[in-house]
């Protein structure tokens, strides 16, 4: 079955045709490890996880590379300001290495909590200085870079086209440029490949241009080429990286080897908070740990993200998370009920399940259309007959969803003994046909934060999520 991705490079949905069908090569821009990753950052990682899983669902083997930026990313996202790592180290009274190790660990803890697969190769910028220097030297040799008193810059005037991914108007930017940070730059859009370090700069390395450190963009180009070659299949990242970072990666690659590094460029949209921007000043910067502290399994956020296509803005609300928590519980309950189900399936039932699987497959292959795919997941979960074959289909879907659908709901394991005792008392009241007592106990259980639901398989106790 064909796969289609919306390609930022071509501005349309393209049929996926791998360079080498035996191995799909992917590069993802990872975190700058100077602070906690937000749930907005994690939304990008969730979409990248779905991409990996979808390719594997289609039978492909994957080589996925993700970088860890631990030097060179300045606060402006350009060539101005302080290195984010150094700023964080100063504010937290730690060394840059301590900052990097701390936030790298937290990042991977969050990936694990969300059941996001770790890429096959994770590479740190500070461990690839040699490759970056060689890359810059080659750009100098090819005539695409020049030296000033402060840095080595990429000369965008040498390119046949810039920008390629975004709709930036370079001529308008030139006309509107009022202040140039470095008057030695030939063009306002020229960007730093390598930055000469002040004497007191903590993170610096020897280079042909003296003690210095890499620019943000050269890191991904050098590491991507090292592990994936001059050209690979897919490059991913957040939509914010299109004009600030990915344009310059393409420029560097064209300058060094004459090629655009990836054939397909996929970008995830922003996360909104209650319809607005996530902002520290508004007090609405949420982390994965905040979801945990509200009493939710972090995977609930992953399921919540599937309510919206990765190329559309997703609006985060705690009400939405509460609804997703209930949905996760229902899906896991359906899996368990089907696993132990004894209903017989007819030939017509089997054909219908096969059609559901085909529809799911078409949905994920259509630019990772998870909202549509989830409609078929629910069709299977609500299948009238309970049979292990339905559980098997749900488990197959979960190889893409990654929501641990076969896991017994943790809420059941955490129900206090007091509630269990009340549930048992209510059960006895019902057996004695004491409906008044039964209703009173139900209301008491509800007041204590739980709902009881009578099903043909017994009593289901559901925690009421509260903000």
Description of each model-found segment:
Residues 1-34, 49, 109, 130-337:
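Alpha-helical recognition segments enriched in aromatics with Gly/Pro capping
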Residues 61-63, 143-149, 384, 451-453:
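Short, well-structured beta-strand/strand-turn elements
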Residues 10, 19-113, 454-457, 461:
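N-terminal, positively charged nucleic-acid-binding surface of large information/translation enzymes
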Residues 59, 94-98, 108-134, 144, ...:
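Non-catalytic interaction-recognition regions
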Residues 56, 140, 446:
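Anion (oxyanion) recognition and catalysis
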Residues 65-71, 100-107, 117-132, 150-159:
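Short, glycine/charge-rich beta-strand/loop segments that flank catalytic centers
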Residues 277-280, 284-467:
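Structural preference for alpha-helix termini/caps and helix-kink/transition segments
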